[in-house]
Structures are given as structure tokens and as C-alpha cells.
């Protein structure tokens, strides 16, 4: 690398000649009132920091300290730490940071170098702080404590010290490890610090808006970044305290609490934070790492957490760092750009530059280089050399081996010496070795790094007295008194001699494994110690562990201690603080500590909290609420409206339930009668949207409405919280549902004739299914349980859910309760015991209370740990502070309320909430309205709360929602909680109805209680206005269970449901660009109603709503269902108009597009470029802007003018004219395309295949992973320069003609040597390139035939003979330096027009041919279509390729397609990224919306990062409910003979119109030759079909080797497993065993299962293997698994196809059928119009009638059998008959009324065909058709149309 190259052009005089003090003075003058340092609860402003440090400096000067003197700082991490540093510097002195924890010997070595004048120490801590440590500093100099100096500072005048500080003055001296056993003091001067800080301000960039974390010790060079970078630019330093340093979670809390935006850390610390669960923080935008190598894996994880990640490089001797590299995912991590005034050289032993690509030693020169080593001229002379390339400068010999990969990229590849870096600390092995050999018993020592652990190999002196003492016991204390802790080896290994190499040096690789030398003591066999041993073994990587071994002495360190913490917390289910792990560092101590903690917890629960309630856990946030209650209440908002308006929701018993008059009797003793005629009923309780949850009508009829009510309510709860199926499925979300009395009445079931529901009724009515059905339907994997606690059930469920969250059993939970009243059983029972209300109304605490009114309903809340909810920005409705559950014990009777029990449960809840009775404002009482229960409850409340009430606090207010909605039993407790949360939100307490006269049985005055007889404002407490509102909720069960919960008002910042900004709340402000408003549903009608609900919401919103919040929430918090629309609008008026159009006119047809897009990305070539292309995108999207800037920097060295100055120049300007030059145009096109791809990629859009036109193919190759970005840029630059250098006598013309016509014309003009075909763009458009005069003649030739031609605006002939061999050689030279990488995406080559084979584009020769040969774009488009591409996204400045591509694929191509999904050009989609006639962002946003409509998964959260928006509450899904429950059921207890109960029959269910489905499609599987070895795992070596398989493998270049077990094939390309078994169970067992073996072995070659007849004809055993394999590929994604089915006899042709399939790694499932290879493809089919088929009915096909069902089955071999009729029918008639049969039998399995309700294209699983239905269908279809079908019928054929197609092929003998 030539030292004068562009890499080293870093001169910047503005950053030179400064000192720290003067720069700080400038900063503090500007930012005096701003916070400079935040430490714990202390904040120091810039003004205060300047004033205090001035006083300290003046004090030091008065004590004789002056310029050039040295002051040692041995300080703890107190808030004044930085002030003391600045004070020393302002006095002109130099400071030496001393870690107070260092051993005395080390401190002595450091301070011996110095002529110390003063040592400043922290006062000795009484709490175990470092204080003055173990060293007597008074032996070296005058010693003062910080407190002494601060006392004296008070008497100093407030003035600036008059000291003339020079840039060359030494600011501080840092000591690092030395090779002789003595540390080296590195002298860093002021100018170096200032140049460094000013450089970082520029790159990576630090501003006065940043808050920078300071966590390093000041003796570590990274502290220079954390202190000086922020303080010299006006930023705020957030200083971590000592207890924060070791605990990553404490650091994470610190970052969150103080809104840190910027931090620097070693990779080790960052790994520890990630392992502790850190995933970034809002506002934390920049992360800098250094001190050790940053791995690509860690870099990738970090870039997912932070907007920018930078890697810094630089030794301590060069002031922290000398270069910065911005980390990009997928790119190498290099040294980066040198700092200003810094140069980097890679030199050989003669100090001469080495060539690019060669290795040398890295030397660093410039303003940051230290002055040398303190008082060590020999070492200084060896390491700090005069710079021969830069006069007057010194260069530092770094010891790092480095290599310039090209002129701008520099990488470190190793060390030239033995220096070691472990967890960011630099260690010279000689330093440690010298300290070891200083021991009298040690003759020699070698120290090495093994797996990030220091190992010392030692030879003892013979005959020493310590021979029996273990080496570690002898040396560890010795070294701990002499070396820092990080330099003490983890392992000490005693050897007799050191192994040597041939040249006599120690052979480090031959030294023994240190683990093998450890002899651990036996671990006792207790469960806990064995569990600890397993965890330590896993983390340390070895099992040589004894009970008393220190974790840190057997390989543990600060990074691995975090892994221990994580695993322990998972094991124990409770927090384990990191400091405790440092304190208890042996298995014995740790086991004792953990056991004590467990016992302490148990004792506390038994003695202090007998109710067993959590008193120490984290608060729980209620992040969503949902309900379905009497009075047509479907939302919490409707509940609040009913409560505040005083609505009475009680009605007479609906006739569809039972005849209240028929069972009425005023006598409570009348058997089978009830005196109660009313209650709280949910009008539509029996209605349900079964299709939404994938439940068939047949199953839905057998499901208790309690299950369907709670299922829909839980869904709405999650949806209101902003969580859809994508985030819920597979999550650790718990489900806790409360229930009470069974909904199901045996009499009703018997009357309904339930035999037709057998198989569904058990689950449909089981209480356990209440929770299980919710978890199953939503895919939740946390703890799931149904709790029966009577009327207390939902509050008990909430209590259990909170406990599960606190114990870490789940991350989120839904708690709910539900009751359904289908029969009068409870009315009769409660009438007999005289607690039922005659009219169904509850009158809580009223003088005329007459019993409870029974009701029904569902309520649910979604819960999270409060910290998690705040982290995730969830909307918090309320905070559950604590809860408790108990039982009243043995009282007067089981049903009598227990006053003592109620008091105990309230007090336990208060204890759990860490609150006192006076903290509670209101109690939502159980309040059923019984004459016994209400006084008992009031008395219990009075005893708990009355003593805490006074004239200031006022009485405790109580009320009950049962007065409005009756007693909803299992749902009641949560209904009360929801009421209280709403009351907190509205700061209003609703009245309790029917309570004009409070009960005289209650002492209201003495008990200091107040019944809310009217609505009352909930005002802040007089004695504490800042206290949040708090309330308790009572809920008691009839069997004696008591529950109480205490909830608290959330902070307003987390409870603002509106989400509107305070400074921008105009909900009809016009936006700069239209925003997308996403709506979706399962059906078109649901989608229309969804639009109606949104329209109503926006119209009736009481608070103004920002459109950006609406758009964001619709996109990111809603599940996106199959039918989709996107409405684009810029203001509310426009959005409302578009919604009205949907409401009035219905959903457009595009919403029903059920075809999933297969995306191909097209990268355009030169000629499409234009001025300002992409500039509009850069202004709006950060990813695009950063990518463009980054790539433009890579082109800087090869272009005369900065690329962006040309790309984004004003049109017609001089700079813009440069775009007409190829050397600018091609880099510009490439830059734009890669930035567009990164933008698409950031939004989650991934292409299935890519294609590039001309230079666009380089961008496509980069996207496909074939070359990295830097290499691609070099290739583009070379190509552009080459083509710009072409003769200007060339020309190009676009002709309206086919390639044969143009070729013929060239021949006729005798111009074959002067003109070439440059591009075949479409079948009828060809571009010719060549000599200008010939091009003109060619144009005239076609114009004479009335064919259009267009001379292109270029004076050069691209892709022609003008590119001669000499010019192409230049391109080849560059291409040969490219390091090609493994292809990650399919790419179509425009050199061949075909799909590129692996490695085809990975050669210089290819790219030379690509520049010269014609562009076969038209053929490439055909290949894309053959690959199933149906959605084409162009990445370029215009829509050129889309237009040409549409011409290529014009017409219906489905006849010739080889791949599924092609339905002709009319179904293809062409999308643009940019369009010159439209706003840049608008074009790409519209295209993104189109992809969403076509089911492409979009990361909408990423899209809105640049737009903004907050999560707000929006309307939930528009359920399409229908009546199912026991269809045909009549009310019992009825004297009336009227028939059907009201409601729709299932035949009113919506009819789906289409669905994505799987079909088998032929692909091209041409035989390919490749050298490889394949193992054959065969059932029998003499199987008749083995011979052709082996022969075909040999012909294809694949060596077959018979193996007996998988292990023999580990080194082969793969193994073919052939299956044959007579037993299905035996086959599945063996298959599962094999998969487990493959997983356990981490088997990397391909495992290909070969079955025979598993698909189609239905070999039952082998068909089952397909299901096993499909499950395995999901379960073991890391394995290479495939399956192939061979139909019919295996011959050489079949075997050859099998060999071809082995080369097609992208097809996991294939079927060989004769000469064809079939693969499954997703496709969309329109619904077939066939006649209804039902069993025992007639099938009408083309006017003919044939019997079906039982009649046909009676004579299966007769001429009238259905089987014979379909075999005799023609193809079209047969297809109709089979479709009708499948449709009818599917209708029967589903239980729908007519076959017309079956959508032939909707998946069996989607509509609810379960395993029972599939078995019945297979049985009936086989009986009707004579076709043997596979056992896994509905998996092989996922929908009716694919099943009927398969039947037809089987019948036709295919």
C-alpha cells in the first residue's frame, strides 16, 4: 500500500493545536445550564462542573502543584470523578489513573515511574467500596482524600486558574501490560485527546443532543471516549456507578432510565448485555465497539438493536482509536477510515510498503500517537519510530499484522508478537511469565490463551518444599498480590518440560489440555448441586468441577457469569442477581445460598402470608380489556356508556332460552320451579363466527356458547392490545379462564339428538376446553388452564395469571371469565335457597335488596409485566399492584359468606400490593344484593379500612356493577376490574343503581363507608394530590372462595389512548404524501363491515386522532387476513370518502386476490438514469439515504466528482450532464439499485429470483450474494471506465423486429463484422450496436418496411465488437481480484437467458462475456415465468424493464408453462420502484401496497420508522356471526309448540369464493453430471429396483456406496434412504428414530427419503412418511431433508430422473411419474360450478341423473355403480362428477346444509375438517370411486379441488 494513497489523505488542520482545557471552556460557556454529568440521583451542569474544577485547580496550584507535575487518581466511581480529572488538567498537571482494586505490587510498579507530587484517593468506604484499597499511597507522595479537598475548595475564589497549557503537555499516563513483568506507562498529550475527540464528533458523530454512557474505569483507554468526546461537544455524560458495572441488567436499566443515545463498549460487554435480554432502547441510536475483535454474528445481532454500529480500531499508544468503520450487515468488519490527521501504513521488515493483498505489520502515524513510554527510552525507541513518509511525525509499531484488501479497505489478520487480548484487556504473556518465575519455587513458565482463558504452564524447581502443594494453590495468591485480576491465569498446569519445535522454540500447540489436569472433588448427589454442575459444565465447556472450585479459577469470567445467571433464572423461575454470583462463586456456596433463599421464601409464605399470595413481585400491567355483557355491551366503551348513563341491562328471560312462565311459581319450595323471571342475558350469546376460527359448522354446533363467547372476547382483547396472529402464534402467552356452573343441560342435549355431534360434543362442552380452545385457536404456548372458583372465577384466574407472569412462566397472559345460561337450572336452584332476585335485578347494599339477579357474559384482560409493557410501549389501562385468594374456612355453612375470610383476603392483597388501607380510594364490591351477603361484606371492608379514614381522606366509597348488568358469575370479577380501570381513565365513579335507600343493616357512619348513589368525580386525594388513584375489587364464590385485587392508575404517559401529539393534534391536517390504510377480513362482507366500523370510529371519536397513528396501527397491530384492501389518503376527509365508497359499493375485486405473489426483482441497465433520481426517497427514508451515501463513498476514489453531486444535480446543469458519461452513469445506476434493494429488504420484501439487464446484472449478483458490495463497486467502476473509453464512432439502435429478422438484415447489409446484436429485449424488439454508418443503414432498412426504429442517445457501441480483447483484458484484471461468494438467491443470467447454475457467475470469464455478449433479456423473462414468477418489481429510475417484460410475456402462457402459478399475462403484476413522472416515495409506497394485497409479507413496523406513528386503539374485527349451538334445539320447560328458536340457520353462513391451494406441477428435471458420492441406505441389497438406481447414479457422475448406518455417510454429498415395510406403524417408528439420529449427529449432508407409491395410489405406510418428513423440516430447519416418491416400476428412466432431482436442492418434495417430475406448488383456482351432491341424493351431470351414496355403494361392481359411471364418462364429465362427489362428501364432513356452501379452493384445515372428518371422507371416497387414498388425505390434498383432480388422475390411470 503506497503511504501517499487516498486512504491517508486525512489532513485537517482545524483539529490540531488544541488542549482539553481550552476546548472544555468553550463548550461550558455555550452549554452552562445544561446537564454535563448525570450519576445516580446527582446531576452536574456544565457551569457547575466548570466552577468546581476551577476551584480544585486553584487549590492544587496553591499547594504547589503546577504544569508538568504528576498527580495519581485512585478514585471510586463517585459523581465528582470527572470533576477531579478536569481540576488536575486545569492546574496544568498530568494525572495517572490508578484502579483502587489493583494489588499493591502493581501499584508500586506504576508509581515508581512517577515523580509524584500528590495522590488523591476516595475516602475509605464503610460499605466495602475500594477506598484507598490495599496500598499505602503515603509512601509515594502526599495523599489527600476527595472529601478533604472538597472541604478546602469551598474557600477558593470562583475564578479560572491562570495556567498556560500547551497542546504538547502530557494530559494523562495509562499503564498497560509489559513484556518484562513491569507495566508500561503510555503518555497521552492534550493535542492527541483533542484531535481524537473532534474526530469522533465528525465520525461516527456525536452532538450536543447525545447522552453518552460512561462505564469504563478511567485506567482503561476507552474512558477517553466516554469522558472527552461528550464533554467537548456539549453532550451529557451518564455515569454508571460501581454497582452497575458488573451487572448487564443494571446497565440496561441505566440506559433506559436516563435515555442514553450513544455508548462505547467492548464486544464482550455487548455480548453480556444481549445474553441478558437487551434488544435496544427507543432513542438509543449509535453504538461504538472496540478493544477486541467484533465477530460477524455479534455485529448482526447488534445492528438489529441499534440504528448505527461502529467498530473502532486503535491501540492505547494511539489515544484510544485511530479509525472508524460503520458496520453493515453482510459485509466484512474492517479497520475503516483513518481519523483526521492520521495515517496507516502496512510495512515489511525494511519499513517499506507491501503491495495490496500482501501481509505486513501495521504502523500508525499522526496526531494521536503517544509521546512514548514513561521513563523507558529503550522501549520507546523500539516502538515509536520517525515516520519516513510524513516529515516531522512519529509512527507507532502496532504489532498487528494487516493487509490492504484494496486501495481503501484494510483488515487486521493477526499479531506479529505474542500479545493477547481477552475481553478487551491487553495482556503481554511475558508480563505474567515474569511474575510467575519471580516465585522462588518456579523454574520456568509459559502463558498462552486457550479459548479466551489464560493458561500458565509451569516447571517447578527440583527439590523445593512446595512440591506437594497444588500449583494453583501456590501461584494464584502470589499473582493476585502482583497482577490485575484479568492477568491472573484461569488454569495452572504443571509440566516436567516444555514440548519444542524443530528450531528449539516452545511448541505451544503441543502443550496439554488444561482441563485434563483438573481433578475435581466428587459432587454430592443432591438435585440442586447436580443441576448447578450441569449448568457450569454447559457454560465452561468441561465437567472437571469440584464443590469448592471457584468458578473463576476453572475457566469462568465476567461474560460467562451472565450465561450462568440466565440458565439459573430459567431453572429456578426467579431472579438471581449477578452480584450474588460473584459472592457465591463455588457450587457449594451457591447451592447453600439458593437453598436458603428457597427456604426463606417458603417460611415467609407460611408465616407472613398464609393465603399464599405474592408480596414481592413486579407490578402487572393491564394492556387490554374486552367484554361481552348484557345490554348489548360488546366493548369496554359500551360498558362505560351503560355505567355512566345508569343503564339497567336486566330483561325478562328470552323465549329462546326457556319459557319463564312455564316454570314460574312464587313458592320457593315448589320443585322444579323458580320465582325469578328475569336476568342479565347476552342477546347474541349463541351466535359465532366459526369460519374466522377455522371451525366447521358441524363442530360449531357442538360447542358450548361459553367457549365461543370467551374465544371471541379473548381475540378482541389481543386485537385491542395490538397483537395479531403473527406475534401471538408460538408465543409464551398464558391463558387463564374462569368458569363456574356448567352451561350444558343434559335435558337439552338429549332433546337435541346429539348423536350427530359425536366426536365433537365432548370437547365442545368440556370446561377445560374454555382455555384450551383459546390457546389452540391463537397458537399460544404458555400455561393454559380453566379455573372453577364459582363467582370468583375470573378474579382468581387473574390472580393466577399475575403469578405466572411474575414467575416467568409466560411473557403475556389473557385472563378471563365466562358464563352462559342455556337453561333455568340456576334460577331453580337459587330460588330454592332464596337468594335469587324475583325480577332478576341485583340491588347491592340497598334497603330493598331481594337477592341476586343472575346473568351471563364474558370478560377478559390481557396482562404483562409492567416493565415489559413499558418497554414495548403498550397502552396501559391499569396496574395490578397485588392480589390475593383464600377460603373462608369452616363457617356457618358452605354457602354463607365469611366475614373473617374476606378481611384476611383484603389484607393479604394490600400486603401483596405493598400498600396501606389509606392508599385505597374505592372498592368495587362483590355486592350481589342479598340481605346476608351485603352486610357481611360491608362489615369486613369497614374493619379493614375504617381506621385509616379521617375527615381529610373521607369515607371509603363502594359500589357494584351488578346493579347494571346483574351477576354475570364467572365473568363478574373482571367486569368489576374493567369498570374500575375505565373509572380511572375518566376520573369518574359511576353510581350504583337501585340504591335510593342504603341498607339499614350496615353501619355506614361508624364503618366510614359511602355507597355511590350517584356519579361522583374521582378527585386526587387531598392529603397527597400526586398519588395515583387506587381501588380494590372484591369477588366471592358461592363455595367460599374469596378473591381481592388492587389496581392502580397508570402514569398518564402510558395511559394516553388517543396517541395524538400535544403540539400536533389536527386530525384533518393534510399529509405530505398519502398514507396506506390497511383493512382485511376473511370475507368480503366482513371487509365491508370493517370499513364501516372504522368510519364510525373516526366519525365519533371524542378526541382528535392523528391519521399517521391510524395508518400505523392498522398496519402494525392488526392481523392481515386473506381479503385485503389498502386505502390511500392524505387527510381525514379523503379517507372518510374512500371508506364510504367501500361501504356503499362493496369491496373491489382486487381484495379477493388469493394468489400469493412470487416476486422477481428486475435491475435495469444503463440508459434509464436521470438527474435527481432517488433524491426524494433519500429525503424520506433513512435506509435508502444511508446506503446511497455509503456506496457513493466507495466510488469516491475512482470518480473525479463526488457521485451524489452528479446523481442529484439539478436537471440540465453541468454536473447533471456527467450522467451521460458511462463512467458516471453505471456507478449511479448501481448505487440507486442497491439502495432500492436495501429499502425493499428493510420492509421485509425478499425476491424469489432476480435478473439484471446489462450493468444491472452486477447489482443483481450482489443481491444474490455472489459478490460483496465493495467488490461489486469495483467491478461497476471498471466496467463504466472501460465502456467510456470505447471509440466515439459507435451507435446503437432499437428496432421493432425479431432477432432472426435483424440477423438477416445484418447479413444483407454485409455488416456482420461491423454491427452486433446488443440486446434482445422482447420477441419483437432488438437493439443493435456497432459502427454509426451501418446503424443508420439498419434503421433505414426497417423504416422502409414501416417498422419503427430509434437511434439511442449514445456515441459508443456497447455489447459490440468495439469491446476488443485488449479492452476486455482490463475488465478481466479487475474481475479476477474479486472474492466470489456462495450464491444465496436464484439469479437468471442474461448471458444465457437461463437460471444460473451454482458458481456460474463466480468467475472473471463470465463477467467479461457479460460485458461483450448480447443481453438475452427476453429469454430471461421467459425463464422467470417458468420459475413461477408472477410479480415483477423493477429496481431502477423508471419502468423500462416492466414495459419490456410485459411485452415478453404478453398473451396467455399457461398452455406452455412448466411451473405452477402462471395463468397468463393478465395475472402478472408489474411494479415500479421509481417513476420520473411521480413523487419517488409515492411510487414505491404504492408498489409496496400492491405487494401487500398479493399476500407478500411486509414489515410494516420498519416502513413506519421513517414516517412515524403510534399504536392507538381501533375497532376490532367485524365478526360474521351465525347461530350454531345445537341447531334445531327447542327451548325446554316449554308449554308452547312453536318450532325453531330464533336466529339464522347455518345455511346462512357466508360462502367463500376461493383459496390458495397446493397442486402438483411438472418441472424440467434434465439430467446433470456432477462428481459426488452418495450413500445408499437400503432395506435389502438385492431389491430389484436397486440395480437401475446404481446404474443411473454412475452415469450422472455420482458414486453410489451402500451404507449400513448414517454415520458412514457423514463425509458424502448425501444419503438416499429407500423405504420398504409392510407395517405403517413400523415405518413411522423407524423414520422418527432416523430423524432423531440425524439431528443428534448434526448430520450436514442431504438426507433424501425415497418412497414408492406414497402419493396418489396411496401406499398407507409410505404416505405417512410424507407427513413425518414435512413435520421434520419444520422441526429441524437446520437439517438438509428431502423426500422423493417413485410411482410405478423403477427402471433406468425413473432412476435417471431421481438422479436429476438430487441436483435440485430447492425442491424438498418431488414425485417421479413416468417421464415427468412433479413438485407441489401453491396456486389459486376459481370455484368450480358443480351441482350439489349429498348422500342419498341424485347427482345431476349434463342433464343425466346417476344414483349416489348408499344406492351406488350397494352394487359397487355393477354397471350402475358410481365407480363404473365415472370410468365410462368423458374427461370433462368425469371431472364434474368427481368435483361434485368431493364437494358433497366435504359438505357432509363439515355439517353444512348444502354442497354449494363448500368452496372448492378453500383448505380443509381452514374450514375445520379435522381428523375425524378426514377419516370419514377417505372411507366414503374410496368406497365410491374404488381409489385407494392416503391416510393423510387432507395433507396430501389440502383442498377439495386438488383432491378431485387427484381422483380424476387415479381413475384415468395416470
UniProtKB/Swiss-Prot annotation:
PKS-NRPS hybrid synthetase; part of the gene cluster that mediates the biosynthesis of pyrophen and campyrone B, which represent a class of fungal amino acid-derived alpha-pyrone natural products. The first step of pyrophen biosynthesis is catalyzed by the PKS-NRPS hybrid synthetase ATPKS that uptakes and condensates L-phenylalanine and malonyl-CoA in order to produce desmethyldesacetylpyrophen. The gene is ATPKS. Pfam families: Acyl_transf_1, AMP-binding, AMP-binding_C, KAsynt_C_assoc, ketoacyl-synt, Ketoacyl-synt_C, PP-binding. Residues 1536-1556 are annotated as: Disordered. The lineage of its organism: Eukaryota, Fungi, Dikarya, Ascomycota, Pezizomycotina. Its EC number is 2.3.1.-. This is PKS-NRPS hybrid synthetase ATPKS. CDD domains: A_NRPS (cd05930), PKS (cd00833). One of its GO terms (biological process) is methylation.
